[in-house]
Amino acid sequence: MPNAECRHNAGFWSAAYAEMPISKFTAYAENAVLPKRKMDGISAYADMPKKIFGGICRYAVMPKNSECRTGMIQTQPGTKIVFNAPYDDKHTYHIKVINSSARRIGYGIKTTNMKRLGVDPPCGVLDPKEAVLLAVSCDAFAFGQEDTNNDRITVEWTNTPDGAAKQFRREWFQGDGMVRRKNLPIEYNP
């Protein structure tokens, strides 16, 4: 199989010698589901067979040593953040973000409700295998009188450029590189 050159083009991952974007294969992230085949990781794309979808695409590969692969993170808790009543005072919940990859990443935190939810620190840089403890705070509010159904924290991260200082830069997220996201819904117990 020829060497592939990975590039980002208008939101689609494409590969050399490919006649359609790799996104058509619904292959986006680790554990991606491909036609009748579940992959264990991004490097497994290099083993994909020729002529998927009736020969429309000759190759759909992502090189194993690709610079465009974004490192993975883990969060503790992994699926949601829970705040317990009463809500007359400010609550703080700590979450841990771990860079489980072999690359330095920059991360930024977004919230869907900036009046009620805050995160400290809201952004930063993590070296490989490094972790940071984030304080997620919930300001006092009238529970039951305000809509809380769509509240969530979103962790966004991307690889830092090679040789970059360990200082967060917003422009890392504004270029054409891959930015990953993990949503952590907020649950409010009465």
From Swiss-Prot:
<dbReference type="GO" id="GO:0031143">
    <property type="term" value="C:pseudopodium"/>
</dbReference>
<comment type="function">
    <text>Central component in molecular interactions underlying sperm crawling. Forms an extensive filament system that extends from sperm villipoda, along the leading edge of the pseudopod.</text>
</comment>
<dbReference type="InterPro" id="IPR008962">
    <property type="entry name" value="PapD-like_sf"/>
</dbReference>
<dbReference type="InterPro" id="IPR013783">
    <property type="entry name" value="Ig-like_fold"/>
</dbReference>
<keyword id="KW-0963">Cytoplasm</keyword>
<dbReference type="GO" id="GO:0005737">
    <property type="term" value="C:cytoplasm"/>
</dbReference>
<protein>
    <recommendedName>
        <fullName>Major sperm protein 32</fullName>
    </recommendedName>
</protein>
<dbReference type="InterPro" id="IPR051155">
    <property type="entry name" value="Nematode_MSP"/>
</dbReference>
<feature type="domain" description="MSP">
    <location>
        <begin position="72"/>
        <end position="189"/>
    </location>
</feature>
<dbReference type="GO" id="GO:0005856">
    <property type="term" value="C:cytoskeleton"/>
</dbReference>
<dbReference type="InterPro" id="IPR000535">
    <property type="entry name" value="MSP_dom"/>
</dbReference>
<keyword id="KW-0206">Cytoskeleton</keyword>
<keyword id="KW-0966">Cell projection</keyword>
<dbReference type="Pfam" id="PF00635">
    <property type="entry name" value="Motile_Sperm"/>
</dbReference>
